[in-house]
């Protein structure tokens, strides 16, 4: 469906001085099929009550234009991550002010930093490992979430959430390439 009205409401609520210029939908059908298969055939069987915890979340692409990031064969790829409080991964926010206000949104050249773009992606986050406010050398070195169930089978958490701004951190497979580029002034 059309996400523009929802995005506009989220931007207006969290960034009252910003104005949504446009929402540009980008869909890679192959990556979307992979995402839907992961969500419907794999993740659904390991989540409590089958809840894959699917959400629309914002992602900043920093110095790289959103179009360039989405042109990659794997879509959002955690291997391009510079790391963060919870290691290398795709950092996703419920609130667009987190990537816009930080150094995460892509600043459009020639606009003096007043025009930015970021992504809004559909992500199936599955079972989250809640980190609270815990940040340490150990959390920064994380390569994957911790073990959730010793099993058998042994199950890991599917994503991590924590820190002062409460982003979600995922490993990549759960991010569908049903993304939209959000242009904000």
Annotated model-derived regions:
Residues 1-185:
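ADP-ribose/nucleotidyl-moiety interaction motifs
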């Amino acid at each position: 469906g059309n996400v523009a009205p929802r995005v506009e409401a989220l931007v207006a609520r969290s960034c009252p001085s910003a104005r949504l210029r446009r929402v540009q939908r980008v869909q890679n059908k192959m990556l979307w099929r992979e995402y839907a298969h992961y969500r419907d055939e794999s993740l659904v069987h390991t989540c409590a009550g089958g809840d894959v915890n699917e959400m629309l979340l914002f992602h900043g692409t920093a110095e790289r234009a959103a179009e360039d990031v989405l042109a990659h064969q794997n879509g959002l790829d955690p291997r391009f991550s510079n790391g963060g409080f919870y290691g290398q991964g795709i950092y996703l926010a419920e609130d667009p002010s987190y990537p816009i206000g930080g150094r995460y949104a892509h600043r459009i050249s020639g606009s003096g930093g007043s025009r930015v773009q970021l992504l809004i992606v559909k992500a199936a986050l599955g079972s989250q490992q809640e980190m609270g406010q815990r940040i340490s050398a150990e959390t920064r070195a994380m390569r994957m979430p911790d073990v959730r169930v010793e099993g058998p089978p042994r199950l890991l958490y599917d994503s991590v959430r924590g820190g002062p701004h409460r982003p979600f951190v995922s490993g990549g497979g759960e991010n569908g390439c049903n993304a939209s580029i959000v242009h904000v002034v």
